[in-house]
Amino acid sequence: MDDVTKALNLVPMVVEQTSRGERAYDIYSRLLKERLIFLVGPIDDYMANLIVAQLLFLEAENPEKDINIYINSPGGVVTAGMAIYDTMQYIKPAVSTICVGQAASMGALLLASGASGKRYALPNSRVMIHQPLGGFQGQATDIDIHAREILALRARLNEILAKHTGQSLETIAHDTERDNFKSAVDAQAYGLVDQVFGQRQEELIQSS
């Protein structure tokens, strides 16, 4: 039994009383009804497809009501993360982001790209930014092509972080040279999140 199957077997079910009797949901489906999305684990194409589908579904249900994404991710594939980022920016509802545990690499970029004033972190969460990683073997010309692609991705990611944090491109480029870990408070000071809180905020309850 692989790790994914084991995890699915541990997902609790919630029973809800409706006018037609009892209805059982897995916990994530029930929370999706409350416009809560969970981005947990490495970001790959499969994860991106799930998140994008949920964002589009919630927009179709109510384009005026906020969506909340809880992030606990070590990062992952840049193109998969960019698919989520572009969808967050594209849809009409404001997307609030909340860091629980960690938001590293692409996870940090998605955390920072939430709606202005609606980006949160819990007090013991960690945020890490860095430049994209890459490794390629092959002919020299192919290696050169991939190296230029990594540099282009790095420039684009730096632009996005600068846009959402208010930091200069030069500062972002310098600060992402190596793994740069930040506490929740430091992430707020840097502009990656807007607020750190230890208790649920009234405005977050109302927005969900």
UniProtKB/Swiss-Prot annotation:
The catalysed reaction is: Hydrolysis of proteins to small peptides in the presence of ATP and magnesium. alpha-casein is the usual test substrate. In the absence of ATP, only oligopeptides shorter than five residues are hydrolyzed (such as succinyl-Leu-Tyr-|-NHMec, and Leu-Tyr-Leu-|-Tyr-Trp, in which cleavage of the -Tyr-|-Leu- and -Tyr-|-Trp bonds also occurs)
InterPro entries (alphabetical): ClpP, ClpP/crotonase-like_dom_sf, ClpP/TepA, ClpP_His_AS, ClpP_Ser_AS
Where found? Cytoplasm
User: Where the protein is mainly located, per its record?
Assistant: cytoplasm
Keyword terms? Cytoplasm, Hydrolase, Protease, Serine protease
- Tell me the Pfam families matching this sequence: CLP_protease
An example GO biological process term is:
protein quality control for misfolded or incompletely synthesized proteins
- CDD domains under this entry? S14_ClpP_2
Which residues are named in the active-site annotation? S105 (nucleophile), H130
Q: What is its EC number?
A: 3.4.21.92
Query: What one GO molecular function would you report for this record?
Result: serine-type endopeptidase activity
GO cellular component terms?
A: cytoplasm; endopeptidase Clp complex
Quote the PANTHER family the UniProt record gives.
ATP-DEPENDENT CLP PROTEASE PROTEOLYTIC SUBUNIT
Q: Relate the protein's function as given in its record.
A: Cleaves peptides in various proteins in a process that requires ATP hydrolysis. Has a chymotrypsin-like activity. Plays a major role in the degradation of misfolded proteins.
Q: How does it assemble?
A: Fourteen ClpP subunits assemble into 2 heptameric rings which stack back to back to give a disk-like structure with a central cavity, resembling the structure of eukaryotic proteasomes.
What the record says about family reads: Belongs to the peptidase S14 family.
Name of the molecule in the record: ATP-dependent Clp protease proteolytic subunit
**From which organism does this entry originate?**
Xylella fastidiosa (strain Temecula1 / ATCC 700964)
